[in-house]
A protein has these predicted regions:
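C-terminal beta-signal and adjacent terminal beta-strands/loops
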Residues: 608, 682-687, 708-760
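Gram-negative outer-membrane beta-barrel transporters
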Residues: 453, 555-571, 577-691, 755-759
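Outer-membrane beta-barrel proteins
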Residues: 164-171, 194-220, 224, 236-239, ...
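Acidic, small-polar-rich N-terminal luminal/periplasmic segments of exported/outer-membrane proteins
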Residues: 13-156, 547
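Acidic/polar loop-and-plug regions of large Gram-negative outer-membrane beta-barrel proteins
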Residues: 216, 222-310, 320, 329-332, ...
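Structural signature of Gram-negative outer-membrane beta-barrels, strongest in the C-terminal barrel
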Residues: 218, 358, 362-366, 371, ...
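Face-selective signature of the C-terminal outer-membrane beta-barrel domain
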Residues: 300-326, 339-473, 500
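Outer-membrane beta-barrel translocator/receptor signature
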Residues: 119-122, 134-211, 219-225, 301, ...
Length: 760
């Protein structure tokens, strides 16, 4: 079956999911063999999913340095701001997962994790839709990105140093060098990156160091071992954007002034506070909800090992191992606390690839000790135009009594509920505090069956057994700490039909069913108000039906594809519950790479609705925060906010997502040593809040760059201008819509960046 390969090819060992053929290294999607979460010997045309591979060079050419910027080169990746530092991708309107070398990372709790450094990235492959049976159950099923770590070159040493400077005192440096220890047998690669960045936004910035080291060994023919270590130390700002997102703020930059007053008369931000508007002013877009005394930092250590050996003709064994340790501490002046006092994840997956069949076993262990407190936050009552004290929420004695003191003066929620006074009602505020451990064991099988010369059926099945224990790590004095154990079995199955009418075109239809988990910070599990692990957290059903077409002519600089999909999945709410979401849509992409030019174009249409499920928001609408004393400014309802609105089950449109978006990126070499490039993203209008009282209009962002290479191509200077037309764009602060009525994020104004790169 030359037209439809089904055998794992073993002459080349690659630890990647999808490879963009290196016409210039920038990624015209081609038909190279691949290994990864969908099996060995695959090409992008062989995989029945919508996929965008992004090579390291393409990341550099499109100036992509965080997950949100992936939308410049990939359709259906529109993303909320993730409080200024998204730690998870968004695919098809839902948070996705981050995999590295085919193994799922801890990352964040609903996106509020730690920034993702691109220092270790050799390639990022963007896969839309549920994970394969090889990958197994995950919390987030809109899709995933798989990072292929950098690897040493075994033929010749090479290195690169880059220095970057931009507006607002943003500086960065990276040293990347690959040594050949034994030609064509073993090598080492080291990449060190440091960032010291100020910010356009008030009281914001980032200071990080990332060290990545990789070792590659080919001890014998048809045998390879890749191991890598990454250490990341980062301090950054939890940036909540601007509160009180009225339509006047979005359209004209006008902000309603006045500090909220609680029912007890306090002007400290709190539940059901009401603002009597005192004026409406043009607010600087840099005036965001931050505080100079906030503390926010993290350290993480990752270890990856991939061993790949050919046992016999068309029989290959692959063993992947992964370990991650995370520590994190955020203490904010608005009373928010999240401390990960140690999270450890260890996973091993063994795959046996026999002709057209893949068999495997997976074992994953996760242990998390963490403390949190988010029950007293209140964004809408705060007047950002007033003194910093407006933003501070010192806890009252009554509030402290419903929490537990972790350190002198620092209060967090206990990890369970207790009735101290015996009145039959719990006496504490619960967040995500937990001391939990979990063991996950999985078995999977995937088989490819040729039906005719041009028709192939791929079937896969998987089962995962979970055993989870959650304990209260900081129970109040005088009570026995609560704990619970839960075991469950999760199932997954998928089927893909491929039809290849000729060498250039592939048609596919995929159907998938999977059950996934719902976790708290760092992948932990919490006790509910009844001091038990909620079994519904292990019963989240996800379905995917997708049909697509891929055009990949051999020897051509062109690649194009299109996909139609219908997908159901869940949305984890702030209180730990889950809401169903149904999505359907269309996405298409086109790539071209010629001798002097490259182009990437993407488009998507998305219809996302609640799947007869409840929804939650900080307030029913922004007007709830105001009284009606100044109808000339805003017609307030006087309800007070936050009021923790709960909306009944419905099929309401999922807010915070555009119906459609378009993206384009490209570059052109117009003279010897000189090149220009740019990118553009256009999004439709969309409602910011559940009741659709505030609308983000159609927006576009245009970026441009000019580069000059000299010294026989070894030296390069590049100037980037971002937001070239200086648009005043807005983005949701967080995924899922909870903050839709209370916060919105102002995107950066026009700014420039200069980069010098020296290769040696």
């Amino acid at each position: 079956m030359a037209a439809l390969p089904v055998h794992a090819q073993t002459g080349s060992i690659q630890d990647v999911l999808v490879v963009g053929e290196a016409l210039s290294g920038m990624g015209n999607v081609r038909s190279d063999e691949v290994d990864g979460p969908f099996g060995l010997g695959q090409t992008i045309a062989d995989i029945g999913r919508s996929i965008t591979p992004v090579t390291e060079d393409l990341l550099n050419e499109a100036a992509i340095d965080n997950l949100q910027e992936l939308q410049r080169v990939a359709p259906n990746t529109f993303q909320a701001k993730g409080f200024g530092a998204p730690s998870l991708p968004t695919l098809r309107g839902q948070l996705g997962e981050v995999f590295s070398a085919g193994m799922r990372r801890q990352v964040g709790n609903n996106g509020l994790g730690i920034p993702l450094s691109f220092n270790s990235v050799g390639q990022i492959d963007i896969v839309r839709g549920t994970p394969s049976v090889i990958l197994g159950t995950t919390q987030r099923t809109g899709g995933f990105v798989n990072i292929t770590p950098k690897r040493p070159d075994l033929n010749e040493p090479e290195g690169r140093v880059s220095l970057t400077g931009g507006e607002w005192d943003q500086y960065g440096a990276q040293l990347d060098y690959s040594w050949v220890i034994d030609p064509e047998r073993q090598g080492v690669r080291l990449s060190l990156e440091h960032k010291d960045e100020g910010s356009f936004y008030d009281y914001a910035g980032l200071d990080s160091t990332n060290l990545f080291a990789a070792y590659r060994l080919l001890p014998a023919e048809h045998m390879e071992w890749n191991v890598s270590l990454e250490y990341y130390d980062v301090e950054w700002t939890d940036n909540a954007g601007i509160n009180r997102p009225t339509q006047n703020l979005i359209d004209h930059g006008l902000y309603v002034q006045g500090q909220g007053v609680q029912p007890n008369g306090s002007t400290v931000p709190g539940a059901f506070a009401v603002v009597s508007p005192t004026g409406e002013v043009k607010i600087p877009r840099s005036r965001v909800h931050t505080h100079p005394d906030d503390i926010n930092g993290a350290e993480t250590l990752l270890l990856h090992s991939v061993f790949n050996v050919e046992l016999a003709d068309s029989i290959r064994l692959v063993n992947r191992s992964y370990y991650e340790h995370l520590e994190r501490e955020e203490i904010a002046q608005n009373s928010f606390v999240e401390i990960v006092d140690g999270a450890d994840t260890l996973e091993n997956r063994t795959e046996l690839h026999i002709h057209n069949t893949t068999l495997g076993a997976n074992l994953r262990y996760n242990d998390v000790l963490g403390y949190s407190q988010f029950t007293t936050e209140a964004d809408l009552p705060t007047d950002l135009t007033g003194p910093l004290s407006n933003r501070e929420i010192p806890l009252t004695d009554a509030q402290k009594a419903r929490l537990v003191e972790l350190r002198p003066g620092l209060f967090v929620s206990p990890g369970a509920q207790y009735d101290i006074d015996g009145d039959g009602v719990g006496d504490f505020n619960l967040s995500d505090t937990t001391d939990s451990s979990s063991v996950q064991g999985g078995l999977f099988v995937q088989h490819k069956q040729p039906l005719t010369e041009r028709l192939q059926l791929t079937l896969g099945a998987r089962g995962d057994w979970y055993d989870v224990t959650a304990r209260d790590p900081i129970a109040p004095e005088g009570v026995e700490a609560a704990r619970d154990n839960h075991s469950d079995f999760l199932k997954a199955g998928e089927a893909t039909l491929h039809y290849r009418p000729n060498e250039s075109v592939t048609l596919y239809a995929t159907s998938s069913y999977s059950e996934s988990t719902s976790n708290s910070m760092a992948g932990g599990n919490v006790l509910g108000a009844n001091n038990q692990i909620d079994p519904l957290n292990f019963a989240t059903e996800n379905t995917l039906h997708e049909i697509g077409l891929k055009y990949a002519p051999a020897g051509s600089p062109w690649y194009a594809d299109a996909a139609l999909f219908d997908q159901t999945r869940s949305l984890r709410n702030r209180d730990g519950s889950n809401s169903g979401v149904a999505t359907r849509g269309l996405e298409t992409q086109l790539f071209y790479r010629g001798e002097a030019a490259w182009v990437s174009v993407g488009a998507n249409w998305l219809d996302a609705e609640f799947d007869n499920s409840a929804a939650f928001q900080a307030a029913e609408q922004v007007a709830d925060a105001f009284d009606d004393s100044r109808p000339d400014i805003i017609q307030g309802t006087g309800v007070g906010a936050p009021n923790f609105a709960a909306f009944p089950a419905s099929s309401q449109r999922l807010h915070g997502l555009p119906d459609w978006s378009l993206s384009a990126a490209g570059g052109y070499v117009f003279a010897e040593g000189w090149s220009v490039g740019g990118s553009a993203v256009l999004t439709s209008d969309y409602p910011l809040d559940y009741l659709q009282t505030v609308t983000i209009p159609e927006q576009f962002t245009l970026n441009a760059n000019l580069a000059y290479e000299f010294n026989q191509g070894a030296s390069r200077i590049r100037l980037d201008v971002f937001n070239l037309t200086d648009e005043e764009n807005w983005t949701p602060v967080f995924e899922g819509g909870y903050f839709g009525s209370s916060l919105v994020f102002p995107e950066l104004p026009r700014h420039v960046q200069l980069q010098f790169t020296q290769r040696f």
